[in-house]
Amino acid sequence: MRSPVQLQHGSDATNGFHTLQPHDQTDGPIKRVCLTRGMHVPEHVAMHHTHDVGPDQCCSSVVQMIHAPPESVWALVRRFDNPKVYKNFIRQCRIVQGDGLHVGDLREVMVVSGLPAVSSTERLEILDEERHVISFSVVGGDHRLKNYRSVTTLHASDDEGTVVVESYIVDVPPGNTEEETLSFVDTIVRCNLQSLARSTNRQ
Amino acid sequence: MAGICCGVVGETEPAAPVDSTSRASLRRRLDLLPSIKIVADSAVAPPLENCRKRQKRETVVLSTLPGNLDLDSNVRSENKKARSAVTNSNSVTEAESFFSDVPKIGTTSVCGRRRDMEDAVSIHPSFLQRNSENHHFYGVFDGHGCSHVAEKCRERLHDIVKKEVEVMASDEWTETMVKSFQKMDKEVSQRECNLVVNGATRSMKNSCRCELQSPQCDAVGSTAVVSVVTPEKIIVSNCGDSRAVLCRNGVAIPLSVDHKPDRPDELIRIQQAGGRVIYWDGARVLGVLAMSRAIGDNYLKPYVIPDPEVTVTDRTDEDECLILASDGLWDVVPNETACGVARMCLRGAGAGDDSDAAHNACSDAALLLTKLALARQSSDNVSVVVVDLRKRRNNQASS
């Protein structure tokens, strides 16, 4: 059985996907993993996609190429207050603390039917308008993704498009393997980024 | 059966003898349930193609406000609440009866405890004549992600099936239904393009939540259980986890098998397609979708496919009724119980001459099954279609 994590998409340059497997750099209970290793990315991008992975945690990243300048993509990605503009699985979102522009602001998202989740409370961790970096962490909600934290970066590609890198780290829930957890989250993230590409091109 | 009835009706008439064979008694007991408003609409529905008999439409409005969901507590406060039916956007319930000599149907579709109504029901009696025989179409669609794929199935699938059946060589029902479902799936997938060009249809725009969000939602789908009933046969096509059950001489015969990702043959199919089933709050395709087949859900193709499984069943004199329902019913009510309830309602009405009574009986059955599902804490939308399959005593009509 082929695991979608090792996605054949990974080597399929035509659809712009690369799903990266974590690379161990140190031994011990906490591993530092750089998810953009082997890619040509700006230094700050590499830094943002480097995670310290504890025991019973896992991390991965999805890369999406978009044929539009980073500014156009950023206009959608920066909307911590309105992730619905490109995330199909979100039914509703409201800011419950702050205005969605400052670190520490909280949003509560309701998830569409048919998914193994109902709601999620998320905290804005990074919003770097200059370098096009956004990060949020999950602080509550009715789902199985504990201690989830994601970082999304945009940088210009050689052909005047945008490279979107979204990486995440999350606890492996009891009853599931690391591989299953990555498979599930990658499916969601990949779907979001594909939708981001379509939404950007429609603008 | 009386026990079930008592369970639903609760403590209204603890000492009253339960006459499960009397339709009048059943109707009276249904009427006692609080928060139900029966609106008899005298408006005559447009005549059906081949059926110009008197038609009457009956709408039952069921309140499903959270506070009203516990039927027992409703019953206790019945005197205060009775007849003060409340309608809100979250509680639109419709039970329709088509009064004519063919066929006799009852349907109920309620939002229940869910925030959104994503079920859709499609009833098209005499949707097709073939070899001078009347064919009837019944469908239940349970949407996920949003309502628009289920809505689209409700609007279109009977037309697609009709066109396919009209060019069907002999009785190639399986092939015809598979083709129809695939066409339906294509229409749903291509809908985005139509939208951009023509704009959405009004009904869609009004009813579809995600329309504003993104015209191209890959992550929306629907189950489809469809039955075409001819004078001789019952053809059931199923894709997803809604279900059709035949009640024959008191025995519940499932005419479809749910498409769950952990069904052994479905699991193998998914794995052979390169997908995987992950137990993530139940068995799910890639950990996401809890069914292995559906209309729509482009993002999970080719693991999740729109191809239905088709059964063709010869009708017999012992057939009593056909129940189509979404998993909002089947998750909490076993096939046998559902058949028992429907049978009791139909028996109360008796077969044959009194067409109105038989229609009411089908509506009663659909409503009672829905109430039972809500009483058993169904957390989903609940949609039920009950079709009377008993042959007339006087043999006036064969379906």
UniProtKB/Swiss-Prot annotation, chain A:
<keyword id="KW-1003">Cell membrane</keyword>
<dbReference type="GO" id="GO:0038023">
    <property type="term" value="F:signaling receptor activity"/>
</dbReference>
<comment type="function">
    <text>Receptor for abscisic acid (ABA) required for ABA-mediated responses such as stomatal closure and germination inhibition. Inhibits the activity of group-A protein phosphatases type 2C (PP2Cs) in an ABA-independent manner but more efficiently when activated by ABA. Confers enhanced sensitivity to ABA. Can be activated by both (-)-ABA and (+)-ABA.</text>
</comment>
<dbReference type="InterPro" id="IPR019587">
    <property type="entry name" value="Polyketide_cyclase/dehydratase"/>
</dbReference>
<protein>
    <recommendedName>
        <fullName>Abscisic acid receptor PYL5</fullName>
    </recommendedName>
</protein>
<feature type="binding site">
    <location>
        <position position="87"/>
    </location>
    <ligand>
        <name>abscisate</name>
    </ligand>
</feature>
<keyword id="KW-0472">Membrane</keyword>
<dbReference type="InterPro" id="IPR023393">
    <property type="entry name" value="START-like_dom_sf"/>
</dbReference>
<feature type="binding site">
    <location>
        <position position="166"/>
    </location>
    <ligand>
        <name>abscisate</name>
    </ligand>
</feature>
<feature type="binding site">
    <location>
        <begin position="117"/>
        <end position="122"/>
    </location>
    <ligand>
        <name>abscisate</name>
    </ligand>
</feature>
<comment type="similarity">
    <text>Belongs to the PYR/PYL/RCAR abscisic acid intracellular receptor family.</text>
</comment>
<comment type="subunit">
    <text>Monomer. Homodimer. Binds ABA on one subunit only. Binds to CARs protein in an ABA-independent manner, both at the plasma membrane and in the nucleus. Binds both (-)-ABA and (+)-ABA. Interacts with HAB1, ABI1 and ABI2, and possibly with other PP2Cs.</text>
</comment>
<feature type="short sequence motif" description="Latch loop">
    <location>
        <begin position="143"/>
        <end position="145"/>
    </location>
</feature>
<keyword id="KW-0963">Cytoplasm</keyword>
<dbReference type="InterPro" id="IPR050279">
    <property type="entry name" value="Plant_def-hormone_signal"/>
</dbReference>
<feature type="region of interest" description="Disordered">
    <location>
        <begin position="1"/>
        <end position="29"/>
    </location>
</feature>
<dbReference type="GO" id="GO:0004864">
    <property type="term" value="F:protein phosphatase inhibitor activity"/>
</dbReference>
<dbReference type="GO" id="GO:0005737">
    <property type="term" value="C:cytoplasm"/>
</dbReference>
<feature type="site" description="Involved in interactions with PP2Cs">
    <location>
        <position position="116"/>
    </location>
</feature>
<keyword id="KW-0650">Protein phosphatase inhibitor</keyword>
<dbReference type="GO" id="GO:0010427">
    <property type="term" value="F:abscisic acid binding"/>
</dbReference>
<feature type="binding site">
    <location>
        <begin position="144"/>
        <end position="150"/>
    </location>
    <ligand>
        <name>abscisate</name>
    </ligand>
</feature>
UniProtKB/Swiss-Prot annotation, chain B:
<keyword id="KW-0479">Metal-binding</keyword>
<keyword id="KW-0904">Protein phosphatase</keyword>
<keyword id="KW-0862">Zinc</keyword>
<dbReference type="GO" id="GO:0004722">
    <property type="term" value="F:protein serine/threonine phosphatase activity"/>
</dbReference>
<dbReference type="InterPro" id="IPR015655">
    <property type="entry name" value="PP2C"/>
</dbReference>
<keyword id="KW-0464">Manganese</keyword>
<dbReference type="GO" id="GO:0009409">
    <property type="term" value="P:response to cold"/>
</dbReference>
<feature type="binding site">
    <location>
        <position position="142"/>
    </location>
    <ligand>
        <name>Mn(2+) 1</name>
    </ligand>
</feature>
<dbReference type="InterPro" id="IPR000222">
    <property type="entry name" value="PP2C_BS"/>
</dbReference>
<dbReference type="GO" id="GO:0009738">
    <property type="term" value="P:abscisic acid-activated signaling pathway"/>
</dbReference>
<feature type="binding site">
    <location>
        <position position="210"/>
    </location>
    <ligand>
        <name>Zn(2+)</name>
    </ligand>
</feature>
<dbReference type="GO" id="GO:0004721">
    <property type="term" value="F:phosphoprotein phosphatase activity"/>
</dbReference>
<feature type="binding site">
    <location>
        <position position="380"/>
    </location>
    <ligand>
        <name>Mn(2+) 2</name>
    </ligand>
</feature>
<feature type="domain" description="PPM-type phosphatase">
    <location>
        <begin position="104"/>
        <end position="389"/>
    </location>
</feature>
<dbReference type="GO" id="GO:0010360">
    <property type="term" value="P:negative regulation of anion channel activity"/>
</dbReference>
<feature type="binding site">
    <location>
        <position position="143"/>
    </location>
    <ligand>
        <name>Mn(2+) 1</name>
    </ligand>
</feature>
<keyword id="KW-0378">Hydrolase</keyword>
<dbReference type="GO" id="GO:0051607">
    <property type="term" value="P:defense response to virus"/>
</dbReference>
<dbReference type="GO" id="GO:0010119">
    <property type="term" value="P:regulation of stomatal movement"/>
</dbReference>
<comment type="function">
    <text>Major negative regulator of abscisic acid (ABA) responses during seed germination and cold acclimation. Confers insensitivity to ABA. Modulates negatively the AKT2/3 activity, which mediates K(+) transport and membrane polarization during stress situations, probably by dephosphorylation. Prevents stomata closure by inactivating the S-type anion efflux channel SLAC1 and its activator SRK2E.</text>
</comment>
<feature type="binding site">
    <location>
        <position position="327"/>
    </location>
    <ligand>
        <name>Mn(2+) 2</name>
    </ligand>
</feature>
<feature type="binding site">
    <location>
        <position position="327"/>
    </location>
    <ligand>
        <name>Mn(2+) 1</name>
    </ligand>
</feature>
